[in-house]
């Protein structure tokens, strides 16, 4: 095999007396350590000391760019961050082998490249950090090297919990309540607790205080993220034939590509965003796509940042009086609670989880999911932002895009692939439970106690899109009626067998029971017309 791209080869350094064991190793048969694109953690114990007989391997491969159609910024951001990480390893004295997307000897598959590297370097061992996606985990577990070598998986040293911790906690339980998991984690890690182990403020959850719409003040914090020119890298990606969606913004790329930049973004959020995050975390605005959100998810999910340091920074900000308790608690709940919880859900139920479709929804996604060309102002705003920025905050994903998709009966598998591709922070372990569980109820209620849907009233209450929308937020069956309204009632009527005994939906079915039959039939007829005309909404 011709040599692959080398980003770093070092001359072995003199070995001190404390490294006698290392000196005994056969330097002609090195250990290969694989670093995946979402494992860019410079604090991992792997990197504590330079080991001349260890070669770190990173690779840009089509098997990773092509399993779904990814956003341009996602591919560009991952490649840029991987290259930055590899270069820093080289600067620190490590041996690095970097396989670029356009190299002639790149076999465009993780395992196939490992085969070639094992033979080329005559390695005696291959180590890899535990993958976060089931697909890669299976590929590496089932890999049979071309020659006898020791293959070892190590921990990624990132999460608060083990893969199976949530499963053990909920053993024998029909439903896994996130709130129970969250309280367990708060106690275990001593977060926002009084000296006697009670929750600070007298309650575990301040979600009721985090539901304000944003009137335009206080002002959104300035966007202080880095600005990179990755035009040259983008040309390489395009020339390699990688297909993407959305805008690359390669000449002014705004996402962090290393830990230093991620820490600067964390500092800025704690100082400027977190004080108002609690009040407006559920707000929608057509005038601002960032509001007070941290924009840390890409850095967290690629492991540039550690969730412990993020949680501790938020707790310290509250302890020092810089942010209100409900802001700190709401943010910590997302990291310590929700993020760890959905990871546990993912590993407990894969691989069947990503094929779930409890409500048997099969309607294709309309074409405007790929261009944002719809007259529904809230959907157009969220979709266009997603295509432009590669990002949408959780309410846009859940209560705008996901809400419409569930009401309209869109295929959850196709929607899952769309979410997995379009967002820069989307990796299957975190995206699939959010999409198939929380958003689409495709898992039959394993994750969510009820479907998260609403009529137009919620979107109107939390945002400002309805003021300028083509559709009438209050109308239900007129020609200009907002599609959310009739679809909402039609959804609960056609899925009575799933939801009418759910105690959390008692009010909904009480209203349906009291609704005149003619009114219900008008709503259902309107829904039929709407669903037959999805492409033109």
Regions found by a protein language model. Give the residues of each.
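Beta-rich, aromatic/charged-enriched effector core domains that present basic-aromatic interfaces
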Residues: 109-255, 436
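Short His-Asn-centered micro-motif
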Residues: 34-38, 59-60, 99-101, 128-131, ...
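A structural signal for the main folded, soluble domain(s) of proteins
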Residues: 94, 101-103, 116-120, 125-126, ...
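A eukaryotic "domain-start" boundary segment
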Residues: 64, 188-299, 480-485, 497-537
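Gly/Ser/Thr-rich loops at beta-strand to alpha-helix junctions
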Residues: 39-41, 105, 130-138, 406
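A short acidic (Asp/Glu
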Residues: 43-47, 68-70, 108-111, 136-142, ...
């Amino acid at each position: 095999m011709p040599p692959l791209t080398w980003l770093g080869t070092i001359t072995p350094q003199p070995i001190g007396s404390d490294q006698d064991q290392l000196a005994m190793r056969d330097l002609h048969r090195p250990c290969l350590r694989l670093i995946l694109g979402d494992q860019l953690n410079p604090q991992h114990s792997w990197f504590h000391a330079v080991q001349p007989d260890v070669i770190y391997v990173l690779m840009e491969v089509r098997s990773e760019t092509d399993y779904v159609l990814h956003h341009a910024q996602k591919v560009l951001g991952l490649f840029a961050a991987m290259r930055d990480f590899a270069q820093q390893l080289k600067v620190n004295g490590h041996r690095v082998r970097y396989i670029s997307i356009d190299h002639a000897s790149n076999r465009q598959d993780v395992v196939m490249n490992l085969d070639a590297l094992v033979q080329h370097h005559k390695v005696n061992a291959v180590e890899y950090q535990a993958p976060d996606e089931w697909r890669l985990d299976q590929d590496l577990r089932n890999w049979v090297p071309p020659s006898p070598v020791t293959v070892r998986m190590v921990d990624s040293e990132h999460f608060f919990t083990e893969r199976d911790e949530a499963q053990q906690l909920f053993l024998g339980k029909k439903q896994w309540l996130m709130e129970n998991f969250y309280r367990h984690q708060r106690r275990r890690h001593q977060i926002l607790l009084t000296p006697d182990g009670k929750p600070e403020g007298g309650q575990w959850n301040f979600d009721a205080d985090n539901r304000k719409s944003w009137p335009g003040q206080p002002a959104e914090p300035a966007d202080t993220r880095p600005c990179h020119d990755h035009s040259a890298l983008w040309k390489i990606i395009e020339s390699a034939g990688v297909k993407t969606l959305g805008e690359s913004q390669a000449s002014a790329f705004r996402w962090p590509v290393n830990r230093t930049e991620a820490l600067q973004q964390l500092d800025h959020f704690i100082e400027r965003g977190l004080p108002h995050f609690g009040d407006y975390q559920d707000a929608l605005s057509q005038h601002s796509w960032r509001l007070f959100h941290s924009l840390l998810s890409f850095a967290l999910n690629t492991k540039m940042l550690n969730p412990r340091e993020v949680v501790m920074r938020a707790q310290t900000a509250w302890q020092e009086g810089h942010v209100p308790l409900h802001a700190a608690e709401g943010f910590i709940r997302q990291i310590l609670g929700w993020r760890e919880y959905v990871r546990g859900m993912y590993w407990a139920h894969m691989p069947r989880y990503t094929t779930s479709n409890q409500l048997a929804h099969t309607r294709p996604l309309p074409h405007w999911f790929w261009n944002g060309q719809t007259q529904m102002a809230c959907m157009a705003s969220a979709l266009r932002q997603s295509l432009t920025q590669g990002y949408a905050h959780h309410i846009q994903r859940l209560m705008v895009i996901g809400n419409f998709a569930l009401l309209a009966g869109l295929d959850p598998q196709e929607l899952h692939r769309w979410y997995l591709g379009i967002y820069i922070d989307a990796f299957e372990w975190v995206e699939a439970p959010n999409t198939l569980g929380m958003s689409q109820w495709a898992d039959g209620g394993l994750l969510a106690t009820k479907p998260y849907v609403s009529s137009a009233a919620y979107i109107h209450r939390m945002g400002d899109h309805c003021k300028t929308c083509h559709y009438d937020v209050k109308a239900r069956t007129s020609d200009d009626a907002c599609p959310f309204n009739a679809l909402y009632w039609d959804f609960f009527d056609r899925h009575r067998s799933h939801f009418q005994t759910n105690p959390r939906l008692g009010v909904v079915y009480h209203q349906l029971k009291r609704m005149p039959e003619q009114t219900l039939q008008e709503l259902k007829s309107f829904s039929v017309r709407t669903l037959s005309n999805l492409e033109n909404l």
